[in-house]
Amino acid sequence: MEATRQYIDFYNEVRDVLASRSCPEMNACREAALQTFSRQGFPSPKVERYRYAKVEADFSPNYGIALAPLGGQLPPHCFRLAEAEPRVRVLYNNVADATDSIVCLNTMLSVDTLVVHVPRGVKVEHPIQISNILKGEQDTMVCRRILVVMDELSEADIIITDRAASQNRFLTNQVVEVVMGDGSHLSLYDIEETHLLCTRYSSVFVRQGRDSSLHHTSLTLFNGHTRNRLDVLLQGEGSEVTANGCVIADKMQHVDNNTLIDHAVPGCQSSELYKYVLDDNAVGAFAGRVLVRQGAQRTLSNETNANLLATRSARMYTQPMLEIYADDVRCSHGSTVGQMDETALFYMRQRGIDEQEARLLLKAAFITEVIESIPLESLRDRLHVLVDKRLRGELSKCEGCKLCG
């Protein structure tokens, strides 16, 4: 509870500063978040969705906390929450899980919210790129908030990237809320390429309307400790979601992906594919729950978690789950954990490929399926290059700076 008290005391010290720098919609949610956070504290591994995370240990170091509002020129269709339309502003904190302590801490301490609003019928021609660059002279915690509002029949690609430009310790607590109107289409990409001293808790909450489609891809290329949460509520008939993920981890890295796909109405489809390549002493975790509610007939759902362990010391925890309360459904789920195919290695070495290169090629081939599923061709091509560099160890040679490439 010491870490919990540390953040409560800090909030009480800076609440006036937060109020002066934020808009009314954000300030109105802080006290309720404080009450929930004070009552619950940081979740322990006994909390099912945090079973594989050491939350209190991650949040215990004495970080300085950034309290600066958004600055600089924003991309097209992007606004500060205070500058967004009133009907958009009221959606703040309307989709996120207000009972989750990590979300509540974000609600307490976030100074600003980046809004991406695509109006009705607009098809955004170029991807909207949101770059989060961690830089500072001291160990720093950053609370980030993003609200994406896709009006009816709108289309967009959004790329969120996390990079580190200095070698300090960083702790990121990010909450992304997505509201998708009827017939809207969104491809949302989350790419993490930081360093071993970075800890990230990212929570993405999506609410989909009728006939909407979401393609979400999470890629962890380099990190220290990452915990990604994805909750998707399919509340409009005919809505679809594809949620894919790719993890490359080595050294002492830890990556935990936790997903919930909630089929609340009939006639919806979901597909999940998460692949991990773990080397050295890396630890991976995947817990994916698909919930088919009563009355959600004609549901189609497929969930797969496949994992490649390149060493005997790497560890993977996998827990795909199906919870079905309807009878007219087609649902499947499964997971695999395996080591390098020695037969394939032998075959490649017989043809003149050295062992190191052969292992690299097998790792790349294993995760190609996730990269190739990305609809955005320019990003797909770029990620093939980044994955190759990552597997060759070229990204980790300058862990303090990820801006080149």
Where are these regions (language model features)?
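N-terminal amphipathic, basic helical "cap/leader" segment at the start of enzyme domains
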Residues: 1-107, 119, 273
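Residue-level "edge-of-site" marker
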Residues: 50, 361-362
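Conserved beta-strand/loop scaffold segments within soluble protein domains that form the structured core
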Residues: 87-353, 363, 367, 371-405
